[in-house]
Regions:
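Active-site acidic/histidine proton-transfer and metal-coordination neighborhood
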Residues: 17-18, 56-63, 71-154, 163
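Charged helix-capping and loop-helix junction motifs
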Residues: 45-52, 77-82, 106-112, 138-142, ...
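Substrate-binding clefts and catalytic carboxylate motifs of secreted carbohydrate-active enzymes
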Residues: 233
Length: 251
């Protein structure tokens, strides 16, 4: 019922095994990665390196829930190179960014091709709302998903809506057509007026309401923990995750 996924920062855990060890310490079965690990693009890694990584995933009992692709989605050769190694590692989803496009429709055309490539490997393609991007509001996300077609899922990041002084639950989620399309809920909270992050439940991002309604709708995605404060220590991460789990217990 509760899938906890963490994206360990390079500041806290620079190496792949260190990231898996951090997952162990905080009790998360799912790990999120960038497509660049210790300076090397995942799609460029050789078979021996990928096999070693796969062995570590088995040893630690972890699953890669998400890989963030940092390249351009129009570069399908690079994207497909990432897909091949991601598939071998058992990754469940890849997130792409839609920067560099003038319209959502233009981004959707390239995203659609990436989504079909990913589908061939049994991998979901994900997009995430970001307050400083083309996909700032829920209607932008809806348009991209509708235009790009199947195998495109969303990552709902409430703090980005809070930074725009929009209520993530009442303004963005409640009337959304993407309620059943959410693959990840970012566990993030922040304050409208100061535009700064806060612990879950202490800001205006309505994280408790979002988690509650998703669970009531049989949410099968991941609650995703990220270093949204910036350079969080191990103690900070513990406090952050504990705060959210406390909210869950209060529901």
């Amino acid at each position: 019922m509760y899938k906890f996924s963490i994206a360990p920062s390079d500041y806290l855990a620079p190496g792949f095994e260190q990231k898996l060890a951090l997952c162990d310490r905080v009790g998360c079965a799912y790990v999120e990665l960038s497509d660049v690990l210790e300076g090397t693009f995942l799609g460029d890694m050789d078979g021996n390196t990928i096999e070693t990584m796969r062995g570590l995933l088995i040893d630690y009992g972890k699953t890669i829930s998400l890989i963030t692709y940092t390249g351009k989605i129009a570069d399908r050769e690079r994207f497909c190179a990432l897909l091949r190694n991601a598939h071998f590692l058992g990754a469940k989803a890849i997130k792409v960014c839609c920067d560099g496009y003038d319209t959502v429709e233009a981004a959707a055309a390239d995203a659609s091709e990436c989504a079909q490539d990913a589908k061939c490997y049994g991998i979901r393609l994900c997009v995430e709302n970001r307050h400083d991007s083309l996909l700032a509001r829920n209607q932008d996300m809806e348009l991209l998903v509708k235009t790009a077609g199947d195998n495109v899922y969303t990552i709902f990041n409430p703090i980005c809506y809070a930074y725009m002084r929009a209520h993530p639950f009442f303004h963005e989620f409640y009337g959304s057509k993407l309620k059943n399309n959410i693959a990840f809920l970012r566990v993030s909270d922040g304050l409208f007026c100061e535009r700064r992050p806060s612990l879950p439940g202490q800001g205006n991002a309505e994280i408790k309401e979002l988690a509650s309604i998703l669970l009531s709708r049989s949410f099968d995605g991941c609650f995703s923990f990220t270093d949204y404060f910036g350079q969080m220590s191990w103690e900070d991460m513990q406090e952050y995750i504990t705060a959210f789990k406390t909210l869950l217990k209060q529901m």
